[in-house]
């Protein structure tokens, strides 16, 4: 059974790229066509690259590795936290702290401090202190929880990282590359494919697209964990109820089993979550 279907990708708006004036020429090979000034990503290639990334993640985890989930943009925060938590992997969905990978020894000390403060709060360690001291300690704990809560159990740098939007997460990407940590990431039409080891061409601005692809990676982790434990297959992402496809999108879907052809019908209105900038109706 396929890891994910063409229909699921279309339903989630994974095929919508940025406006044609905002692109990285290196992404040309991943572009199928453009419609009304918006690039349309070649989902046939997306499916192929998903399979490659899925296999890599599954094998990495099956052999004892870990995957860090990274996505701090608003559209990705919820799915990053949910899917990483589901499979017990570390995640960063708030601000990326410089040195989180390259200076992990210092970060680990801050994690120990977080656990120390939590233990104090739970065991009555705040008793006997002034209100001001308790307030300061509570603020410190909350700040550490917000920035490091997703990696609280991480004992070493991850084996690979999953990234939603390599442009926004350029610090994480740079640190991973410096340490030769493999990068799996969504590649929108404004991204640089040269910085990613396992690219997945797709829309990194739509909530449903980011959620679907993050779920795919988490499912690969789950399957790897089961293989590590000697179990069966992991849970594959399930199709969700979606709006009817526009006629041109149906043509893309119909062409999935044949040679792709440019669609000629007018595009439908994509989901409201595809674009976060108020000046453009679709992923710019």
From Swiss-Prot:
<dbReference type="InterPro" id="IPR001865">
    <property type="entry name" value="Ribosomal_uS2"/>
</dbReference>
<keyword id="KW-0689">Ribosomal protein</keyword>
<feature type="compositionally biased region" description="Low complexity">
    <location>
        <begin position="250"/>
        <end position="272"/>
    </location>
</feature>
<keyword id="KW-0687">Ribonucleoprotein</keyword>
<dbReference type="Pfam" id="PF00318">
    <property type="entry name" value="Ribosomal_S2"/>
</dbReference>
<dbReference type="InterPro" id="IPR023591">
    <property type="entry name" value="Ribosomal_uS2_flav_dom_sf"/>
</dbReference>
<dbReference type="InterPro" id="IPR018130">
    <property type="entry name" value="Ribosomal_uS2_CS"/>
</dbReference>
<protein>
    <recommendedName>
        <fullName>Small ribosomal subunit protein uS2</fullName>
    </recommendedName>
</protein>
<dbReference type="InterPro" id="IPR005706">
    <property type="entry name" value="Ribosomal_uS2_bac/mit/plastid"/>
</dbReference>
<dbReference type="GO" id="GO:0003735">
    <property type="term" value="F:structural constituent of ribosome"/>
</dbReference>
<feature type="region of interest" description="Disordered">
    <location>
        <begin position="250"/>
        <end position="284"/>
    </location>
</feature>
<comment type="similarity">
    <text>Belongs to the universal ribosomal protein uS2 family.</text>
</comment>
<dbReference type="GO" id="GO:0006412">
    <property type="term" value="P:translation"/>
</dbReference>
<dbReference type="GO" id="GO:0022627">
    <property type="term" value="C:cytosolic small ribosomal subunit"/>
</dbReference>
């Amino acid at each position: 059974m396929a890891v994910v279907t063409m229909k699921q990708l279309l339903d989630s708006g994974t095929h919508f790229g940025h406006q044609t004036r905002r692109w990285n020429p290196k992404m040309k090979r991943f572009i199928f066509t453009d419609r009304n000034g918006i690039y349309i990503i070649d989902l046939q290639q997306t499916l192929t690259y998903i399979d490659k990334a899925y296999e890599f993640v599954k094998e990495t985890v099956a052999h004892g590795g870990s995957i860090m989930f990274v996505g701090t943009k608003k559209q990705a925060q919820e799915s990053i936290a949910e899917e990483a938590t589901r499979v017990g992997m570390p995640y960063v969905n708030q601000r990326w702290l410089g040195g989180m990978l390259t200076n992990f020894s210092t970060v680990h000390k801050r994690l120990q401090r977080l656990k120390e403060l939590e233990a104090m709060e739970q065991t009555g360690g705040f008793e006997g202190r002034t209100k001001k001291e308790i307030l300061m300690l509570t603020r410190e704990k909350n700040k550490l929880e917000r920035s490091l809560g997703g990696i609280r159990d991480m004992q070493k740098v991850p084996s690979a990282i999953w990234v939603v939007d390599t442009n926004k997460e350029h610090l994480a990407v740079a640190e991973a590359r410096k340490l030769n940590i493999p990068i799996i990431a969504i590649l929108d039409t404004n991204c640089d494919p040269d910085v990613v080891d396992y690219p997945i061409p797709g829309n990194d601005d739509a909530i449903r697209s980011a959620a679907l692809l993050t779920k795919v990676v988490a499912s690969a982790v789950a399957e790897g964990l089961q293989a590590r434990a000697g179990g069966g297959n992991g849970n594959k992402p399930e199709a969700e109820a979606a709006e009817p496809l526009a006629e041109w999108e149906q043509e893309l879907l119909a062409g999935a089993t044949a040679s792709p052809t440019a669609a000629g019908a007018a595009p439908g209105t994509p989901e409201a979550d595809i674009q976060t900038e108020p000046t453009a109706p679709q992923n710019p």
